[in-house]
Regions:
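Short runs of predominantly hydrophobic/aromatic residues within well-ordered alpha helices
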Residues: 20-27, 44-45, 62, 66, ...
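Short N-terminal mixed-charge amphipathic segments
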Residues: 1-56
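Generic structural signal for short, solvent-exposed loop/turn connectors between secondary structure elements
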Residues: 19, 37-40, 61, 175-180
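Generic structural hydrophobic/aromatic packing signal, biased to beta-strands
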Residues: 9, 16-18, 48, 69-72, ...
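C-terminal charged interaction modules
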Residues: 70-190
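A broadly used, surface-exposed interaction patch
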Residues: 37-39, 46-51, 56-90
């Protein structure tokens, strides 16, 4: 068992370095491609692959490289990844968008780690960032998630939550993902 933070992945017996020491910014850029609904899945994979690895052109097995990248992003072993893929509930409500919500996540993670993760030149490994993110307690970010969760489940908001929602609706509402085809239909004279 390796107890260290991963800085490389092994693909077909050869080690390949993750760009910038697997800094959270590299991973969030990859996640951003997956959140971009204007890209098809193959393009999302390709863009993330090119971003994640320090020397992606030296990798000959792109499918395995993408799988290994997703293992690192999801912070899982291969067995956990396979089990999660088989059990994943596609109907679970989406509660966050890393790109939209980063301005709320970064201060909360920084509070846990004791330094500002946005400091230029300071590397924070993705797993360190993710571990701190999982430890976030009461803060504005957790309030946003709580409100989104209640709304997604059709639960009634408390009065103080309704007040926050009215005041910060733009921050709390997630972008609606519609396809180009749906946009075209909405803009037509139907």
């Amino acid at each position: 068992m390796n107890w260290d933070l991963p800085l490389t992945v092994t693909i077909d017996g050869k080690e390949h370095e993750i760009d910038n020491g697997c800094d959270y910014r590299v991973v969030l850029n990859c996640i951003g491609f997956y959140e971009d609904t204007s890209l098809d899945l193959q393009t999302q994979h390709q863009a993330a692959f090119m971003t994640f690895y320090k020397d992606p052109l030296s990798i000959t097995n792109a499918n395995e490289a993408i799988k290994q990248m997703l293992l690192i992003i999801d912070c899982k072993t291969e067995a956990e990844f396979e089990q999660n893929s088989a059990e994943q509930n596609q109907n679970s409500p989406r509660l966050m968008n890393w790109t939209k919500d980063f301005k709320f996540i970064a201060p909360a993670v920084s509070r846990i780690l004791g330094y500002d993760v946005r400091t230029p030149g300071r590397c924070t490994h993705w797993w360190t960032f993710l571990g701190a993110w999982q430890e976030i307690g009461e803060c504005f970010w957790s309030t946003i998630i709580s409100i989104r969760n209640k709304m997604a489940k059709g639960q009634k908001l408390e009065e103080w939550e309704r007040k926050i929602y009215r005041e910060r609706k733009k921050d709390i509402d997630l972008p609606i993902n519609i396809t180009d085809e749906e946009k075209e239909w909405l803009n037509s004279d139907w």
